Amino acid sequence: MALWGGRFTQAADQRFKQFNDSLRFDYRLAEQDIVGSVAWSKALVTVGVLTAEEQAQLEEALNVLLEDVRARPQQILESDAEDIHSWVEGKLIDKVGQLGKKLHTGRSRNDQVATDLKLWCKDTVSELLTANRQLQSALVETAQNNQDAVMPGYTHLQRAQPVTFAHWCLAYVEMLARDESRLQDALKRLDVSPLGCGALAGTAYEIDREQLAGWLGFASATRNSLDSVSDRDHVLELLSAAAIGMVHLSRFAEDLIFFNTGEAGFVELSDRVTSGSSLMPQKKNPDALELIRGKCGRVQGALTGMMMTLKGLPLAYNKDMQEDKEGLFDALDTWLDCLHMAALVLDGIQVKRPRCQEAAQQGYANATELADYLVAKGVPFREAHHIVGEAVVEAIRQGKPLEDLPLDELQKFSHVIGEDVYPILSLQSCLDKRAAKGGVSPQQVAQAIAFAQARLG
């Protein structure tokens, strides 16, 4: 059924109807639409539009419909209703007759859909926060199990300084913690109810909107009706959080894809998250990680698309806003799926400690330690930097690590170098010296793990 029509003398062209209808995607708001309708029916009692008996009849019918939807959601898409609001109202009228036609009194689809979408966002943010914290916990557990796995850290994808696999895991814990914080902040701003704002100018019925907001689980009601029906900041905020979160997951995936290569060989992924080749029998491809990386682009696209949709809209509601849902639904679904998949990748990952350590000992990753040693002996850092660079060139020429150069050769570059340099150049020394807060020393990593465990509970 259409919720409009008296103004029109011709039926809508079928092509326009297909173009205009949104049920194929806003069916996902069915539960929220029904919950909002129950609350609205209670509000109508307070202003005398419905009796308590009528409201009870409507609420009972709506609750039955809610259970029907949960049991068989596909029934919605079997309808030719324009949108989810039309579908719910039509089903309600089927159940209670003319009484169902009283429910929309004082309400517009503009404030109705704004409310539905905010309720859906609140539910989905809760799911995202749970998945985010589960992935953080998986990373912390992986870190705890790999505190002694020394590996090279990289800048410019060149070996730079030794780190541990645990320290690498904890870097992503920090990123995910910021993602969690962004979601919590966004939740605060979207937790205001637009219901009761009507089409744009407010409702003509003296409904207590704060009470109505409380019935729906919102912290408060919105303050301006024009803004309320045209506000989609919460969509942009969640898309932005998703875009940033997916960048983090994409980087996580890229790191592990590299670590999993034959050239690096630092980790081996579980068979449960890899696939083979239809031609090459030996292949074990990191498809789960590649898909996480690949799906990042669609989320960025959803954010950009929504910004472009909203940028030129006058107040208040415009049909353009119907375009807010598909991108949002897809982006948050994608983010949620990728959070779950990233946790699954960590479940069963094998860190190849000998290969990690071998790589950490290559590439002159201890060169900075030699520079710091010279500084401790009174050599200015810039001069020490130059001296070590020359020593590295000589070590490369001889095909040796720095610690294998004899003392007399090292002293050619600086007379202050003594026998005490060799312990300094060990991998363990490289780690131990990074003992300031946030560093890679075993003590700092252990503290970071303990802090994360306490925060995550």
Swiss-Prot record:
* GO CC list: cytosol
Q: Name one GO biological process term.
A: arginine biosynthetic process via ornithine
Record's subcellular location: Cytoplasm
Keywords from the UniProt entry = Amino-acid biosynthesis, Arginine biosynthesis, Cytoplasm, Lyase
Q: One Pfam family, short name please? A: ASL_C2
Name the chemical reaction catalysed here.
2-(N(omega)-L-arginino)succinate = fumarate + L-arginine
Q: Which pathway does it operate in?
A: Amino-acid biosynthesis; L-arginine biosynthesis; L-arginine from L-ornithine and carbamoyl phosphate: step 3/3
Q: Which GO terms describe its molecular function?
A: argininosuccinate lyase activity
What is this enzyme's class at the first EC digit?
A: lyase
- Assigned EC number: 4.3.2.1
Q: Which domain of life is it from?
A: Bacteria
| Alphabetical list of SUPFAM superfamilies matching this protein | L-aspartase-like
Q: Which Gene3D superfamilies match?
A: Fumarase/aspartase (C-terminal domain), Fumarase/aspartase (Central domain), Fumarase/aspartase (N-terminal domain)
Instruction: Family membership, please give it.
Output: Belongs to the lyase 1 family. Argininosuccinate lyase subfamily.
Q: What is this protein called?
A: Argininosuccinate lyase
